[in-house]
Design a protein with these regions (language model features):
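Terminal-region recognition feature
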Residues: 1-121, 128-212
Length: 212
């Protein structure tokens, strides 16, 4: 075998190794999922977004909540017996507001008991999804995060803060437009949180939580 053949073999093994590792990880997750379902007599849905080296040559791939996730989770919920408890394992940095809101509303409308498990973190849209559940179970050091929306690379709350601190005459048109979008997005999220919480607490308390 020549040096060129060895280099080619090394390249091929390096390329497929992340794929093999990902398949093994998925198989392991499926075994754990099945065991939890048997022990709790429930339907378990995983919504896990963590940095995993699963593309060519093992470069990190970051995942967030997207429309594909909402389609898969909502389909799984609709295919579950309404009498069966629903357990959702949530580990995500957040993602697309529309997708997270769709999942949250589907969970909120589910007639059976829904429990969300947060082993490490559920930020932004992940927190929105968690708030839709009947019960949230977290590990001792797990965290939830604020549900403030993002406008591209900018947090909506930060855009609004800039507008509050500067005179309107000193703010360019683009920033004013962003501020208007940020205000609308923030109001939408606040109303959505109230909608998800109003059957779990009184209206005033729901408004207070939504404003956090």
């Amino acid at each position: 075998m020549s040096m060129l053949d060895l280099l080619w073999l090394f390249f091929m093994l390096t390329a497929i190794q992340p794929v093999v590792r990902q398949k093994l990880l998925e198989t392991s997750r499926q075994r754990v999922l099945s065991r939890i379902e048997r022990e709790r007599n429930s339907r378990v849905i995983l919504l896990i977004h963590r940095q995993e080296t699963m593309n060519l040559l093992g470069f990190p791939l970051f995942r967030y909540i997207d429309i594909d996730d909402s389609e898969e989770v909502i389909r799984a919920i609709h295919m579950t017996d309404p009498q069966l408890p629903l357990d959702i394992v949530l580990h995500t940095p957040g993602g697309l507001v529309l997708a997270a809101l769709q999942i949250a509303r589907a969970i909120h409308a589910y007639p059976g008991k829904v429990t969300v498990f947060v082993p490490h973190y559920a930020m932004s849209g992940g927190t929105l999804i968690a708030l839709a559940a009947d019960e949230i179970v977290m590990s001792p050091h797990a965290v939830l995060g604020p549900v403030d929306p993002q406008l591209g690379q900018y947090p909506a709350a930060s855009v609004l803060k800039v507008v509050e601190q500067k005179p309107v005459a000193d703010i360019d048109d683009q920033t004013l437009i962003l501020a208007d979008l940020a205000r609308k997005a923030t109001d939408q999220i606040r109303r959505s949180v109230v909608e998800l919480l109003k059957d779990k607490m009184d209206a005033d308390r729901a408004e207070q939580v939504a404003a956090m």
